[in-house]
């Protein structure tokens, strides 16, 4: 009877964790999806992409610090974790934001966000190149179809600026794949989410300040007051709300499952762009969205099935070892 009760309790806990993970991931995706609209508005008010990335992290640091202190979270971090957090924060989170914010200058935000969602392709490539993971024929075909989805967005795009926007958008998928993989590979998901987000924001703010000063792209004096308001909202919405809830989503669901529910981000961006800016949705763009997002969803499902199969094989091997 006790074992039955424990089993039921464990099932309920797993079910509750799954619901939490889904909720947190959808909140994160929605917040990320609305961010491009604010970025586009801030750009029109004098903010450069570099300045926005710097400010969004700067503004959220005191908020996160207060939250950590209020919850009595130990802010000490070991040297190895610090190094890994710096690598993931700069080359993952910061690079992704910088590439995306620059891409918004050349392409509609909905297009940029959808192209950015090719990142599962890069996750698979990281597994192939770095970890020598095998890619099945079916998975390889899905990856190819997802990549082909890019061509649907070449409709009516003339000049090098549009092509640059596409390149930046796709590259942002690569850096984001590194961020998602790095959180798990370096076991940073075991660190308190508020604490980790605080360190990521600090590293990002420092690096972006230096980068902006060196490149001369810090536009603080050219920005009107409303641009600062947008930057603050972006900071709270992304570096605090979206990043924090995404980490919780990964914690409760795992990166592969969380990726499915992250699909709410491009949907939010496309619908938001249509409502706010009145950007038309052509049949080619709709088809491109369907091809990329459909392929990514299928890719994620294939990954989940592969993980389940590996877990089953491991359990069977363990059972056989126990008999011996």
Regions flagged by a language model, labelled:
Residues 31-36, 65-110, 116, 152, ...:
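Specific transmembrane alpha-helical segments of multi-pass solute transporters/efflux pumps
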Residues 19-24, 50-67, 87, 142-145, ...:
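Hydrophobic alpha-helical transmembrane segments of multi-pass integral membrane proteins
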Residues 29, 55, 97, 112-118, ...:
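Helix-helix packing/entry segments at the starts of transmembrane helices
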Residues 2-55, 159-185, 206, 313-324:
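Glycine-/small-residue-enriched transmembrane alpha-helix faces in small-molecule transporters
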Residues 126, 135-155, 208, 263, ...:
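Hydrophobic transmembrane alpha-helices of multi-pass small-molecule transport proteins
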Residues 32-33, 88-97, 120, 154, ...:
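Transmembrane alpha-helical core positions of polytopic small-molecule transporters
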Residues 51-61, 100-134, 139, 172, ...:
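Specific alpha-helical transmembrane segments that line the substrate/conduction pathway
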Residues 34, 41, 45, 60-78, ...:
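Membrane-interface helix-cap regions at the ends of transmembrane helices
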């Amino acid at each position: 009877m006790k074992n039955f009760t424990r089993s039921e309790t464990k099932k309920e806990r797993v079910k509750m964790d799954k619901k939490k993970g889904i909720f947190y991931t959808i909140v994160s995706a929605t917040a990320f999806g609305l961010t491009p609209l604010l970025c586009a508005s801030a750009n029109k008010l004098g903010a450069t992409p570099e300045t926005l990335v710097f400010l969004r992290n700067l503004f959220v640091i005191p908020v996160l610090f207060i939250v950590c202190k209020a919850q009595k979270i130990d802010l000490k971090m070991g040297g190895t974790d610090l190094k890994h957090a710096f690598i993931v924060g700069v080359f993952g989170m910061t690079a992704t934001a910088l590439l995306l914010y620059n891409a918004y200058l050349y392409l509609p935000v909905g297009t940029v966000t959808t192209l950015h969602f090719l990142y599962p392709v890069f996750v698979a490539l990281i597994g192939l190149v770095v970890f020598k993971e095998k890619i099945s024929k079916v998975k390889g075909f899905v990856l190819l179809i997802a990549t082909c989805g890019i061509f649907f967005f070449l409709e009516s795009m003339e000049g090098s600026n549009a092509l640059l926007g596409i390149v930046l958008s796709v590259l942002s998928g690569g850096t984001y794949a590194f961020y998602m993989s790095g959180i798990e590979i370096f076991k940073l998901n075991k660190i308190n989410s508020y604490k980790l987000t605080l360190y990521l924001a600090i590293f990002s703010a420092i690096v972006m300040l230096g980068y902006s000063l060196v490149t001369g792209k810090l536009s603080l004096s050219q920005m009107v007051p409303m641009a600062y308001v947008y930057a603050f909202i972006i900071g709270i919405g992304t570096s605090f709300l979206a990043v924090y809830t995404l980490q919780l989503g990964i914690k409760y669901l795992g990166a592969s499952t969380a990726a499915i529910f992250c699909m709410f981000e491009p949907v939010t961006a496309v619908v938001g762009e249509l409502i706010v800016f009145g950007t038309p949705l052509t049949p080619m763009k709709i088809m491109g969205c369907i091809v990329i997002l459909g392929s990514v969803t299928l890719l994620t499902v294939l990954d989940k099935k592969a993980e389940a199969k590996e877990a089953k094989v491991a359990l069977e091997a363990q059972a056989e070892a126990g008999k011996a």
